[in-house]
Amino acid sequence: MGASENVQVMLEIFRSIERRDAQRFLDLCHSDVEFHWPPSLPYGGASRGRPGTSPTWSDTWLPLQPGETERRMDPRVVAAGDDEVVVLWRQRGINPDGDRFDGPVLGLYQVLEGKLARAQMFYFDTAALVSFLAKTRGTAET
């Protein structure tokens, strides 16, 4: 597949995440897809394949994204090649106290045979994100 087709795959993946269409998301991923998140995040580190017992992005963010505003990722393709796509997107959330997080993320995605094979995310301000999530966990515990 070429760059144009890979871009379409990635944009469809972002649409499936925004719509909370887990089946469509899984259909667009290789069965042994790799995800790489900053290690300081609750869902940080590397994982391969379908979700296991470790915390996932979905475990963390679905409760913090009750509406379309928080779910909107505004993906913008920055670069694309024969097997990689770079996308700038927004991570948004709101906690029970009404505190909001809205930060940019740069994702490097490998697309093979029309499916996502590897994703690595780079947050611009991981410290602010960790602080927001820690405060959110504190709110949930009280």
Residue ranges with predicted function:
Residues M1-S31, K135-T142:
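Short, low-complexity N-terminal intrinsically disordered segments enriched in polar/charged residues
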Residues V9-R19, G44-S47, L64-P66, L88-W89:
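Short, mixed-charge, low-aromatic patches
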Residues M1-E5, S58-T142:
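A beta-strand edge to alpha-helix "cap/lid" segment located at domain peripheries
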Residues D21, E34, F124-D125:
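Poly-acidic low-complexity segments
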Residues R24-L26, H30-D83:
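A solvent-exposed, acidic/Ser-Thr-rich amphipathic alpha-helical stretch
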Residues M10-I13, F25, V33, G49, ...:
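Hydrophobic pocket/interface hotspot
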